[in-house]
Amino acid sequence: MLMLAAVMALRAPTAGAQSADPRLLALSCAGCHGPEGRSPGTIPPLHGQNEAAIAAALRSFRDGQRPSTVMARIAKGYPDQEIDAVAREIAAQWK
């Protein structure tokens, strides 16, 4: 629950505010997906995923097109610009 609170604190700001740093957003992903994106258990790994796949998954969660327990809540506040930025950061970090 504490990790969820940390992730929610880092999510996208309200309209008109400055966008969050994609490096910080990507770091928050490690709480569930592991420090190198090699997820334990049933959490999908991010390691080795390309930018387009990560961005598409985040949009699907955000838009309610992909079932989830936590990801829909996390992705809900992200505009397309931040989804693209965090997807780019994750893909670059966790090759």
Label for each model-derived stretch:
Residues 34, 63, 91-95:
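Residues at helix-coil transition
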Residues 7-27, 42-44, 55, 60, ...:
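Electrostatic cytochrome c docking/interface patches
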Residues 21-22, 36-66, 72-76:
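Gly/Gly-Pro-rich "capping" loops immediately C-terminal to redox-active cysteine motifs
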Residues 1-2:
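Bacterial N-terminal signal peptides that target proteins for export
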